[in-house]
Amino acid sequence: MTNTEKYKQLRSMIPEMRRIKHIHFVGIGGAGMGGIAEVLVNEGYHISGSDIATNSVTDRLISLGAKVIIGHHADSVEHADVVVVSTAINHENPEIIAAKERRIPIVRRAEMLAELMRYRHGVAIAGTHGKTTTTSLIASVYAQAQRDPTFVIGGLLNSAGTNARLGTSRYLIAEADESDASFLHLQPMVSVITNIEADHMDTYGGDFEKLKTTFVDFLHNLPFYGVAVMCIDDEINREIMPRVGRQIVTYGFSQDADVQALNFNQIGHQSQFVVRRKDKEDLALVLNLPGEHNVLNALAAIAVASEDDIDDESIVKALAEFEGIGRRFQHLGEFNTANGQVMLVDDYGHHPSEVLATIKAARAGWPDKRLVMAYQPHRYSRTRDLYDDFVEVLSQVDCLLLLDVYSAGEAAIPGADGRALCRSIRLRGQIDPIFVASPDQLASVLPDVLQAGDLLLTQGAGNIGALSKLLASTNLGFE
């Protein structure tokens, strides 16, 4: 009997869990929601869900036997035993209202993830940036070591063709979402914090101290024999470490890191470095991802794997053969246009620090290329809160095509839109950005902008990802 079968049997022995047969997801098309739904459908639960449109996540779930309903309707929850809700769903959603009227339990995504983690050895990855890549790297190392983990990732793991998988071992590797503080529901055995910056501040009442305390509380959900893995290069991580009453393993480029990277060198898409660990020989590695920020993500994976006595051969092979994640510096191809050959890369980063890391990786790997960025800001509140940082970072490309803000359901905020950002960047004087009023217009603008040898980077967390794939299918608008 596999561990997965044991967990199913154990749940069936709990009287309370025997009542749960039908689980309904409101917002099932999101990567995090869809990932949990995929694990549960493979565990034998009847899964249904709703969303406003189909996508690759819903298509996969349908192929696995889940029922997906387009649109939100009160009768969709009629036979559900529990309703799982995405943080993006408004409380006025008809399915939420109907579930309350029927007294059907409503839980957040993280609560259901915590239930999956209850009987497993959980590894939870938190932090403002790098969660998806770090989670993917850890899952890949464990898979290479034949540990066959269950994983739930916020992006598409290319090697698996999915963002979630039900494994047969006791391991569950998952992202921990701090955006709504719901990661406090999790009780893992190992917790990773990549970094801490001011983001999602509405959740924390605009109080950065409250955000930091919440991360400390997250680490204190570890058992006393658990391990906190923290990037010591991050200033806030270093600041909160004295408050953490658990064993800590640090990683970074810093000399005092327990797992330290040395001799970093980037050649195109690959990063080369040496890792130094206590009581182990130095290990030369090639990571099939660009940029120092991705080396930090890899160090987290190395730290977690080393604590679990995974062999170095598996670590080396997993990092060298890593096939990447969807929309994380994703190389979409080289295109022969009327203006010459252009390289297209798509990236999800939408915080100034993430955008800067992507720019640095592009500069380091392709120093001779002109960097053209098509950037779509994500959320008016983030644009407002980090406005000056966006102006500074976006000024560092050679040519900027700036789209309007992808609202993600927020109301517009005066002075925090794409036009205002464009004006401020122009006033800074380093570059003369081009405002693109509608995503549909980007393809018509590109032929007048692109030059031979350019690297075109589509950047942002909104629908620019779908737009980049459309550009790839139409030869960057030259057809």
UniProtKB/Swiss-Prot annotation:
Reactions the enzyme catalyzes: UDP-N-acetyl-alpha-D-muramate + L-alanine + ATP = UDP-N-acetyl-alpha-D-muramoyl-L-alanine + ADP + phosphate + H(+)
Pathway terms, separated by semicolons: Cell wall biogenesis; peptidoglycan biosynthesis
Localization of this protein: Cytoplasm
Xref: SUPFAM superfamilies: MurCD N-terminal domain, MurD-like peptide ligases, catalytic domain, MurD-like peptide ligases, peptide-binding domain
Single biological process term from Gene Ontology: cell division
Residues involved in ATP binding: 127-133
Predominant place of localization: cytoplasm
Gene Ontology CC terms, in alphabetical order: cytoplasm
UniProt keyword terms in alphabetical order: ATP-binding, Cell cycle, Cell division, Cell shape, Cell wall biogenesis/degradation, Cytoplasm, Ligase, Nucleotide-binding, Peptidoglycan synthesis
Entry keyword annotation includes Translocase: no
EC number: 6.3.2.8
Any one Gene Ontology molecular-function term assigned to this protein's record: ATP binding
HAMAP family named among the record's database cross-references: MurC
Summary of the function given for this chain in its UniProt record: Cell wall formation.
Family as reported in the entry's similarity comment: Belongs to the MurCDEF family.
Protein known as: UDP-N-acetylmuramate--L-alanine ligase
